[in-house]
């Protein structure tokens, strides 16, 4: 979050590094004492022909600039910007010549589930002053789902991707639907019974024509839930990280919260450990927000 994110390569740069929010203040003397650890770490990686990803990005930028390599791109479009770190954005900036409509970024600070990658565009050579727009209308999620999902983010820092804060109050959804139901259980057996009952409810009548996904907080919980539902005779499928998802209404899908990003279903059941809400970082709450807002029509939550 400091050395790699800021592209620091020597002791002098580390002395000047920003360490906002780190909790512990390091004096100049302490920074000098700590720096050899980073140097040795990079030396050990290099001896094994390895690099940290952020260092690889930084080296690629140096090659593009110092060697004067002509870009093959006239424009770059970037989605999920909130999950890119500073060095990745600097590389994108270096990959296309500055000009009209050279870079287009789309992102949502509410869905930043990798806090260590937090970046401000203006600090990465991307000037968006007077050129940014906030989109306040939610076309996917019902207003009821949106409000409950936002409640999980209460107290979380939501940024605007450029060192500013985002205001959640101005957002609204165009569609309406049932208020999300939340149930909490003390063991997996009770949670499993609830899950099976909800799956049965959501696959009857008109709801049977809608797509359904169970989104879990871990692979272990996802696999457990899938096995329980499969034993009830339902057709099931796991959405893996390295595959696309072709949604069919006769199949119950199972995904982790991280994999669910970018997906959408008519109906979603979120299955989460209670510890996710107790996480000291904002990441757990943002994962719940992401999971709930994958639903177009209805979202339900089970804590165990």
Where do the protein language model's features map onto the residues?
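ATP-hydrolysis module of ASCE/P-loop NTPase motor domains
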Residues: 1-30
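Conserved helicase motor core of SF1/SF2 NTP-dependent helicases
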Residues: 27-30, 36-50, 62-71, 75-290, ...
């Amino acid at each position: 979050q400091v050395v790699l994110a800021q592209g620091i390569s020597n002791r002098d740069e580390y002395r000047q590094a920003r360490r906002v929010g780190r909790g512990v203040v390091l004096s100049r003397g302490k920074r000098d004492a700590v720096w050899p650890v980073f140097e040795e770490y990079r030396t050990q990686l290099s001896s094994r022909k390895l690099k940290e990803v952020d260092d690889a990005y930084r080296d690629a930028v140096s090659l593009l600039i110092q060697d004067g390599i002509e870009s093959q791109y006239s424009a770059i479009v970037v989605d999920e910007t909130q999950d890119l770190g500073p060095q990745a954005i600097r590389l994108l900036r270096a990959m296309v010549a500055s000009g009209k409509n050279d870079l287009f970024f789309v992102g949502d600070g509410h869905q930043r589930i990798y806090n260590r990658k937090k970046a401000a565009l203006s600090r990465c050579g991307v000037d968006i002053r007077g050129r940014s727009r906030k989109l306040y209308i939610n076309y996917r999620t019902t207003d009821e789902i949106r409000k409950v999902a936002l409640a999980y983010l209460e107290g979380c820092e939501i940024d605007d991707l450029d060192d500013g804060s985002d205001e959640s109050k101005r957002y609204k959804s165009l569609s309406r639907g049932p208020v999300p139901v939340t149930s909490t259980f003390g063991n997996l057996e009770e949670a499993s019974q609830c899950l099976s009952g909800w799956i049965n409810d959501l696959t009857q009548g008109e709801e049977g024509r809608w797509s359904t996904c169970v989104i879990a907080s871990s692979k272990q919980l996802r696999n457990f839930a899938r096995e329980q539902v499969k034993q009830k005779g339902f057709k099931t499928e796991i959405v893996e990280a390295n595959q696309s998802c072709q949604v069919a209404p006769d199949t119950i899908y199972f995904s982790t919260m991280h994999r669910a990003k970018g997906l959408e279903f008519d109906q979603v059941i979120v299955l989460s450990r209670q510890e996710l809400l107790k996480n000291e970082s904002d990441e757990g709450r943002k994962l719940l927000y992401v999971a709930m807002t994958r639903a177009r029509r209805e979202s339900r939550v089970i804590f165990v």
